[in-house]
C-alpha cells in the first residue's frame, strides 16, 4: 500500500461547478476522487480540463440527473464495472467501479428516495438491497476496496444537526438506516465515524434557511473500507471550505488519508 488521499464529492451539476471542482483539486490534490450528480451527458464531461491539471477520468453521465465519475491523479482509472448487478432494466447512472493506484474504488450515488412513502422510496430500498448483495463479495476480497459516495443516508442522530426537522425525510427513515447498518455489519469500516466516534461531522448543508451559515448539516457522504484496506486508515475529514465558496455545491468533499503502513 502506498500513501493515498481518496475523496468523494457530490458536485451537484458538473457544468455549474467545474470552477469549484478544479480549484478544489488543485488545492487539495486528492489521489482519487469520486464524483456524483454530474447532471450531464457523457459528451459534456470536462475530460480535457481535468487532464490539464493532471487527472485521468472515467465517467457515466445522464442528462439532467445522476451521473458518477472516478478521477485519478497522474493515472488513468481502469474500469471494472458500470452499474450494479440485479436489475438489467435500471438505466440510472449511479455506480461506477475502477482499479486506481492499487485500490478497487466503487463510486456510488444512492437514490434520495423522496417523497416517501412512494415509488421513489421503494426504488431507494431496492437499490440498497442490490448494493448490499454486491458489497458482500467486495468486503471479503483480499484486495483493498473502498465504497465512496453520496449514500443519501443519515446513519444516526449524531450525523444531523436536528433530526426533528427531518423525521419524514427518506434520509432518516428506519429502513434506510437499517440498510446502511447491514452494510457495516458485513465488516465495512465507516472511516469518518471510526476516527471520530462522538464528533458531529457534516458533509451536506441545504441551500435553504441558511443551513450553511448556521452549520445545520447532515453527514450523508461516506467512505466505507473493507478489512483489507481499513488497517491503513490514517486520517479523515471534510473540506468544508469548499462549501463556503461562491456558487458552491450543497455538499463538501469528504476524504480519507491512507498510510503506507498499517495502523491497526
Predicted regions mapped to residue ranges:
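Surface polyanion/phosphate-binding segment centered on an Asp-His-Pro turn
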Residues: 237-264
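Metal-dependent phosphoesterases centered on the DNase I-like endonuclease/exonuclease/phosphatase
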Residues: 53, 127-220
Amino acid at each position: 500500500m502506498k500513501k493515498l488521499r481518496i475523496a468523494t464529492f457530490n458536485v451537484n451539476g458538473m457544468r455549474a461547478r467545474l470552477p469549484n471542482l478544479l480549484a478544489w483539486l488543485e488545492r487539495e490534490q486528492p489521489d482519487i476522487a469520486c464524483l456524483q450528480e454530474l447532471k450531464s451527458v457523457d459528451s459534456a464531461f470536462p475530460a480535457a480540463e481535468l487532464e490539464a491539471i493532471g487527472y485521468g477520468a472515467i465517467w457515466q453521465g445522464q442528462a439532467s440527473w445522476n451521473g458518477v465519475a472516478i478521477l485519478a491523479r497522474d493515472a488513468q482509472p481502469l474500469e471494472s464495472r458500470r452499474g450494479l448487478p440485479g436489475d438489467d432494466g435500471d438505466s440510472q447512472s449511479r455506480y461506477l467501479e475502477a482499479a486506481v493506484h492499487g485500490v478497487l474504488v466503487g463510486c456510488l450515488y444512492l437514490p434520495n428516495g423522496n417523497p416517501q412513502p412512494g415509488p421513489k422510496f421503494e426504488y431507494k430500498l431496492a437499490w440498497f438491497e442490490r448494493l448490499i448483495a454486491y458489497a458482500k463479495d467486495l468486503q471479503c476480497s483480499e484486495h483493498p476496496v473502498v465504497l465512496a459516495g453520496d449514500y443519501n443516508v443519515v446513519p444516526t442522530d449524531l450525523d444531523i444537526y436536528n433530526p426533528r426537522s427531518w423525521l419524514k425525510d427518506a434520509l432518516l427513515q428506519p429502513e434506510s438506516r437499517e440498510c446502511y447498518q447491514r452494510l457495516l455489519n458485513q465488516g465495512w469500516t465507516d472511516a469518518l465515524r471510526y476516527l471520530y466516534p462522538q464528533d458531529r461531522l457534516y458533509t451536506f448543508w441545504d441551500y435553504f434557511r441558511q443551513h450553511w451559515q448556521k452549520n445545520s448539516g447532515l453527514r450523508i457522504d461516506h467512505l466505507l473500507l473493507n478489512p483489507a484496506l481499513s488497517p491503513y486508515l490514517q486520517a479523515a475529514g471534510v473540506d468544508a471550505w469548499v462549501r463556503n465558496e461562491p456558487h458552491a455545491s450543497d455538499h463538501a468533499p469528504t476524504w480519507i488519508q491512507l498510510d503506507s503502513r498499517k495502523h491497526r
